[in-house]
Amino acid sequence: MSGYEGKITPAGVLALFKGRRSIRRYRPDPVPDELLAQVLEAGRWAPSASNRQPWDFIVVCDAEIRQAVAEYAAYFFLKWAHVAEAPVLIVLCGDTKNRFYRQFLHEDIGLAGGQMLLQAAALGLGSCWVGGVNRKAIGEILHVPESHEVVGLLTLGFPAEEPEPPARKPLSQIVHYDVYGNRQPGGDVAAGRVITGLPGIVLRKLSIKFRG
């Protein structure tokens, strides 16, 4: 874990998490290449199942292509206007060829996207994860091969808004200890008994290293 001791603090990391916002209004200024490269580098270093790194990142800066993608960045009748307005889109695709590992694909891509969001915030850039899209249509626009799947995209640019901090549930509402229902350590809810399904594969015996 060497290489960053003394350069960041736990409090600083937590402050970054708390300060990040989903930005949906952007200035027209282009994103400098050196900042874009750092965002992509953050995604490259995300963990993945067996360190397979199944991702490809498509950087879309061309205005016409961005507009074409934006036409299919919609969920039912909701169209995400900020997709057309952001100066940069990063479309995250995943390799689906391996039948076993494809079950982890969305988790892996989500981790890469999350690291990009945080790096963007650290650089003073605004970003927003967009998951409600027509993946097939966007894949066709961007010539994504059939062996790959569009999982989601990020909008990226300099923010033209400062959203208020979003509400968050307190830990007391979302944390359980040992089993669901124990709100305090040492609660009286006992572990359950498995009554459905078959035991999972013991992956350790298969010498599969899950997270790289």
Name what the model sees in each region.
Residues 1-212:
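Acidic, surface-exposed loops and disordered segments
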